Amino acid sequence: SGEDFLSFMRDEVFEPLGLRHTVADHTDSIITFRTSFYGKREDGTIVNAPYVDNSYKWAGGGFLSTPEDMVRFGQQHLGEGFLRAETLAELQTPQTLANGESTGYGIGWSSDEQDDGDRTYAHSGGSVGGATLLLLVPEHDLVVAGVVNISGPAARIVQRVAQVFEDHLEALE
């Protein structure tokens, strides 16, 4: 494209998708509504997370976002539109090892089958003082995003929320 990475992401992804609250985590900038990040000691005490410069990994997780923007992004992975069907298949299809065993992971998306047979795709992220999970359930046109500002997994919370929505949607069918 000839553009630097951050300009490309802004011009070709964030602006076209309306991701108004997704920005690179510039540590030297004031970012409106940037949250504080926390950790937990072994005794359960909540403490401020240490400073981390995420700019070295912008392409692999150095952005700040909101659940709303994450859901908008996830909606583009439910079906063809912003991305071609072939691209979605490439991203979501689990890779296969040389021995034929599935990795359960595509390009950025883990793939799983729930007890009810619904296929899910998920992408998690974590840094010192925060964690995220973006969960897609294409059979129900459902996207759930969770963001927590403390080190540790967000998965349990997001999976519970998704299950509530799925149960409700299935009851309507």
Regions found by a protein language model. Give the residues of each.
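Short, surface-exposed loop or secondary-structure junction motifs
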Residues: 1-127
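Short, well-ordered loop/turn and helix-capping segments at boundaries between secondary-structure elements
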Residues: 19, 79, 97, 149-153, ...
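Non-catalytic surface loops within mature trypsin-like serine protease
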Residues: 21, 113, 138, 150-152
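Glycine-centered structural positions embedded in regular secondary structure
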Residues: 35, 108, 143, 157-158, ...
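A short local loop/turn or secondary-structure capping micro-motif enriched for an aromatic residue
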Residues: 56-57, 127-131, 152-155
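Short, gly/Ser/Thr-rich active-site loops of penicillin-recognizing serine hydrolases
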Residues: 114-118, 151-173
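Short, well-ordered beta-strand elements
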Residues: 131-150
